[in-house]
A protein has these predicted regions:
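Non-catalytic cap/lid and distal C-terminal segments of serine-dependent acyl enzymes
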Residues: 1-177
Length: 177
């Protein structure tokens, strides 16, 4: 990370950047496997705030960001745990619920089953629009995180990103694309 814009920005703006290893977990508690959602959204923030008194636990100072699977994961974490994160930077972050699942015994299918199971994940906590709808229905819109979402025009998952974009532009005022 040395000699990167991240290090320069951290030094210039005086904030802590924590980059946990979450493999290809999408920051979720896996159907079969590790509990990355609990780690990223609960354990890690608690550990950081307990170990480093200079890092505030006030949600307004706690952001989550990610790219691709991590982009989905950071949106998932912030929408499911709105009292933890106030802002999201989601890059190339489509909703995994919008990805067609074919159980063809491929590595991709096996990984999807490990993460989410073999059922449709719409209307579950794995679906970003479901989590956002739940946040609004539970009258917690004031806790909704500010979302910055970006995706390059040549990204192979651009269509999935546009589905997420269109949903948030239609339903929420805390979203920027």
């Amino acid at each position: 990370l040395y000699h990167t814009s991240l290090v320069d920005t951290v030094n210039e703006r005086h904030f802590a950047a924590v980059l946990p290893e979450v493999f290809e977990s999408c920051f979720v508690n896996m159907n079969i496997g590790d509990r990355y959602e609990s780690f990223v959204a609960k354990e890690l923030p608690s550990t950081i705030h307990n170990m480093f008194a200079c890092i505030s636990d006030d949600r307004k100072y706690n952001y989550v960001s990610g790219f691709s699977n991590g982009g989905y994961g950071c949106l998932h974490s912030a929408l499911k745990y709105p009292s933890t994160f106030s802002k999201v930077g989601a890059f190339s972050a489509g909703d995994k619920a919008d990805s067609v699942f074919v159980n063809d015994n491929s590595t991709k299918a096996k990984n999807r089953i490990l993460l989410f199971g073999d059922k449709d994940i719409h209307n579950t906590d794995y679906c970003l629009t479901y989590l956002a709808d739940k946040l609004i229905a539970d009258n917690k819109k004031a806790l909704a995180p500010d979302i910055y979402h970006a995706c390059g025009s040549l990204d192979p998952w651009l269509d999935m990103n546009h589905i997420v974009r269109d949903y948030f532009l239609e339903h929420n005022d805390f979203y920027n694309y």
